[in-house]
Amino acid sequence: MKSQLLSLAVAVTTISQGVVGQEPFGWPFKPMVTQDDLQNKIKLKDIMAGVEKLQSFSDAHPEKNRVFGGNGHKDTVEWIYNEIKATGYYDVKKQEQVHLWSHAEAALNANGKDLKASAMSYSPPASKIMAELVVAKNNGCNATDYPANTQGKIVLVERGVCSFGEKSAQAGDAKAAGAIVYNNVPGSLAGTLGGLDKRHVPTAGLSQEDGKNLATLVASGKIDVTMNVISLFENRTTWNVIAETKGGDHNNVIMLGAHSDSVDAGPGINDNGSGSIGIMTVAKALTNFKLNNAVRFAWWTAEEFGLLGSTFYVNSLDDRELHKVKLYLNFDMIGSPNFANQIYDGDGSAYNMTGPAGSAEIEYLFEKFFDDQGIPHQPTAFTGRSDYSAFIKRNVPAGGLFTGAEVVKTPEQVKLFGGEAGVAYDKNYHRKGDTVANINKGAIFLNTRAIAYAIAEYARSLKGFPTRPKTGKRDVNPQYSKMPGGGCGHHTVFM
């Protein structure tokens, strides 16, 4: 009798002390998660219902978008929080923060001809600057790239190598009156300077075609440019949603995330409703199983304005807490209409940008997912242009998937993935046409299954995965860009 009472006391103590991270009801009777079982729980109808819900949040408000701090994004955050909380399987929180929102518009005229330009967010305003145009060398990332006579002139800079913010700052140091950054790939260019900086000058983006034409004209003679930039600024309260499984080892956390906000131009259903709903679908499917390692899901805010939400989160963790995160997986645009199956190049073999130790193994795992089904895939540059940036800067292994943004699909890629050559992976990238109709159902379904495949693997075991690198600082030069001018893997057009 005494031993029975002791057992009861232990059980009661365990229950009463298990509030934080307490295993959900029925946990012992759930089957252990496997890759096949978790993938089989992924249903296209659930994914499409999710993206349609996000579309409804955009449609319900005059802005017709889901920009952080706006009504469409507030609805998105509340819905994600409530949906995940209702499962009872996760400890869920909203992480409040305040960030500076910016909206900018530009008008550009060269020698009497109007050009289609996009102001960089966080650009200083400009009221009818009229000045001669000069051209910077070598992407304008160093002081020596700017002509000696730059002072008081508007400088034309090609995109690439460094961030838009750095280009604007260098132009400011050279005492330019303004800067125009033109694309280094076909198509228009919009982006962000990443925040306010006293060194910045009024800055606008221009298409590759128009930029090259201007450079040619400057080489032939004097070009006069008129530039107007209207910029609005506002501090906005917003939230990340963080959900961690109640069960599993909380010292061995598998983390994944997707940003939940859109740009001003439209509802952002591929960018990045696709990633948000992809990980939500996996989160709900995971509730049918038990696991060995805890899994932490994150829906980031304000990615489109400089990876603000994910950076805020990572900076909120000390080295000890962040060391519990054994790897981070990022999913930003996984339903592109003219898609290509792309995996972050964690081993650096394709783009010579290597992630922290373990990033290569993440890449190989996703390669195996596609290879086992005979599905083509290719690497995409590990540039730091999406929400994994803050993690790799602190030496957390990372990886993920991306189906393409504004870059044009090649004939060689059509042979691999189908689709249309000479057309962007997502022709509605950062535009009002990024609606539910913009989603490639096959791509989003396949990539959501790939997420499930990876989560099942790592939630079950980290056997064979490299020992987590010591948490610390790592030099990363994000090639930010995801606005027309980057790519969401690639996201936030910073560069």
Curated annotation (Swiss-Prot):
GO biological process per UniProt: proteolysis
Thermal behavior of activity: Optimum temperatures are ranging from 40 to 50 degrees Celsius.
Pfam families (alphabetical): PA (PF02225), Peptidase_M28 (PF04389)
UniProt xrefs under InterPro entries: M28_fam (IPR045175), M28_SGAP-like (IPR041756), PA_dom_sf (IPR046450), PA_domain (IPR003137), Peptidase_M28 (IPR007484)
GO function term, MF aspect, one: aminopeptidase activity
UniProt enzyme class: hydrolase
GO cellular component terms listed in the entry, alphabetical order: extracellular region
Record: active site: 303
Enzyme Commission numbers on file: 3.4.11.-
Main location: secreted
UniProt keyword annotation of Hydrolase present: yes
Inducing or repressing factors: Expression is strongly increased during growth on protein-rich medium. Expression levels are the same whether keratin is present or not in the protein-rich medium.
Carbohydrate-modified residues: 142, 235, 272, 352
Subcellular location: Secreted
Binding-site residues, Zn(2+) 2: 271, 304, 430
UniProt keywords, alphabetically: Aminopeptidase, Glycoprotein, Hydrolase, Metal-binding, Metalloprotease, Protease, Secreted, Signal, Virulence, Zinc
Leader sequence segment: 1-21
Activity modulation comment: Activity is inhibited by EDTA, o-phenanthroline, bestatin and amastatin.
Needed cofactors: Zn(2+)
Site (Transition state stabilizer) location in chain: 429
Summary of subunit composition and partner proteins: Monomer.
Reported function: Extracellular aminopeptidase that releases a wide variety of amino acids from natural peptides and contributes to pathogenicity.
Family: Belongs to the peptidase M28 family. M28A subfamily.
The protein's name: Leucine aminopeptidase 2
Organism: Trichophyton rubrum (Athlete's foot fungus)
Phylogenetic lineage: Eukaryota, Fungi, Dikarya, Ascomycota, Pezizomycotina
Gene responsible for this protein: LAP2
